[in-house]
């Protein structure tokens, strides 16, 4: 197994090195703010970090460009629902915030990630499992006013420790986590590629991305700020009817992918099967369908 891991890492490096070309630079140098989301936890009232709160936070930052957690190839297509519901929400409301939205995520293949999960050293798996359990306990017992406060302080430190100290870069475990370092490198490149004319960029991704995105931006000479809370929790609020329609379309597409009536690549099918996005979208619709904003 050790020899296989060495060979695997060698293949990994041979794949990555051509991709790690001269870092992308934005001109003029934009101001970049990193804002963490909580995925399905936005739909739980006790977290005091709803999509309405997220919108207020983004609006208060006055972005020219919002970089969101959808790959360019999935954006507005059959696979958009595979990505976090809040990303489609932000894409839909961005024009009302006088901002552009750019789909900037990047993903490795499901087969490659699955193979790495099998090959991942047991001691690393055990450390990650323990860390996940400890983090869950901290989140449940945290005394911060909102989940936002925890995610942007203690949560950042935990994520940085997990991905830099426990997992590391260019390791089997790194690939088992979706090629985490390369993924965040590509996210930054995609954001900067979309940054023409943007004075202020807000990168809105799952909060665990924050420390690695900050590192990747620093490697390009950009000092990114971590967002501080600018909203007062206002309850679950509502979402525009266009968001409900978009979520419903995305949910229908995922269900059609799963039942075979919508043909996609084997990789896309495997990703949908191995995700909980159907449940996430159902939760989003259940939470917000009755409280949609009026146009």
Residue ranges and their predicted role:
Residues 18-295:
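Compositional signal for N-terminal targeting/processing segments
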Residues 1-7:
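Bacterial N-terminal signal peptides that target proteins for export
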């Amino acid at each position: 197994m050790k020899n296989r891991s060495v060979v695997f890492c060698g293949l990994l490096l041979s794949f990555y090195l051509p991709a790690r070309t001269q870092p992308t630079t934005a001109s003029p140098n934009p101001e970049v703010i990193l804002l963490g989301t909580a995925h399905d936890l936005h739909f739980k009232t006790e977290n005091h970090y709803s999509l309405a709160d997220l919108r207020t936070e983004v609006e208060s930052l006055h972005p020219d460009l919002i970089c969101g957690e959808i790959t360019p190839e999935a954006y507005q297509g059959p696979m958009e629902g595979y990505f976090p519901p809040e990303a489609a929400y932000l894409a839909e409301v961005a024009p009302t915030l006088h901002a552009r939205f750019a789909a900037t995520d990047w993903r490795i293949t499901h087969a490659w990630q699955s193979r790495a999960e099998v090959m991942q050293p047991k001691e690393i798996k055990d450390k990650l499992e323990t860390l996940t359990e400890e983090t869950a306990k901290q989140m449940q017992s945290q005394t911060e006013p909102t989940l936002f406060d925890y995610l942007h302080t203690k949560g950042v430190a935990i994520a940085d420790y997990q991905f830099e100290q426990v997992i590391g870069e260019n390791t089997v475990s790194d690939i088992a986590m979706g090629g985490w370092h390369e993924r965040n490198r590509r996210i930054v490149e995609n954001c900067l590629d979309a940054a023409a004319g943007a004075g202020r960029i807000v990168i809105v991704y799952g909060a665990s991305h924050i420390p690695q995105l900050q590192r990747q931006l620093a490697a390009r000479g950009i000092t990114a700020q971590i967002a501080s809370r600018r909203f007062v929790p206002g309850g679950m609020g509502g979402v525009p009817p266009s968001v409900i329609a978009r979520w419903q379309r995305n949910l229908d597409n995922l269900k059609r992918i799963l039942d075979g009536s919508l043909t996609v690549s084997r990789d896309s099918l495997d990703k949908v099967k191995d995700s909980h996005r159907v449940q996430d979208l159902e939760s989003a619709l259940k939470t917000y369908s009755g409280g949609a904003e009026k146009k």
